[in-house]
Regions:
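C-terminal transmembrane module of polytopic alpha-helical membrane proteins
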Residues: 1-40
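N-terminal TM1-TM2 helical hairpin plus the immediately adjacent luminal interfacial "cap"
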Residues: 30-138
């Protein structure tokens, strides 16, 4: 006779810690923005935090084209390639991203080591940002 009790099973699949870390990082940014938007964090200027983060960390094709043309790569602009995945246009946008990170990240993390998952995540983000910069018409 088996001692397996189906009522004690978790309804969720176990998630690798690196995937949980990425999802919590995205959720943390979004929670901070939501609290600021509601006036519960950061004072009156917090209402504009999302727009400020988008302006500071979004991938701007004209900016990257100009950097390419001049051969100048300021670190504060290169940071955009790995920072933009943590800033989203809205709460709904962030939720969709978190769901996909949890689902797809679990599959990737089952095959790769934690450090490799981070390389895939940030590498894909950087490559996607550069491709976007040079494919989008000016």
């Amino acid at each position: 006779m088996s001692s397996h009790n189906p009522h004690s099973e978790s309804p969720f699949n176990a998630l690798p810690p690196v995937v949980v870390f990425l999802a919590l990082a995205i959720a943390g940014v979004e929670i901070g923005l939501q609290l600021g938007q509601r006036g519960l964090l950061g004072g009156p200027e917090a209402v504009g935090w999302r727009l400020g983060l988008i302006q500071r960390f979004s991938v701007v094709p004209d900016l990257f084209r100009a950097m390419w043309a001049q051969g100048i790569w300021p670190p504060e602009h290169l940071l955009r390639l790995v920072a933009y995945p943590f800033v989203h246009a809205s709460f709904g946008h962030a939720i969709f991203v978190i769901v996909f990170i949890l689902a797809l990240g679990k599959m990737v993390a089952e095959v790769f080591a934690a450090w490799a998952v981070l390389v895939v995540y940030f590498g894909a983000s950087a490559v996607a940002g550069l491709v976007y910069s040079f494919v989008v018409p000016s």
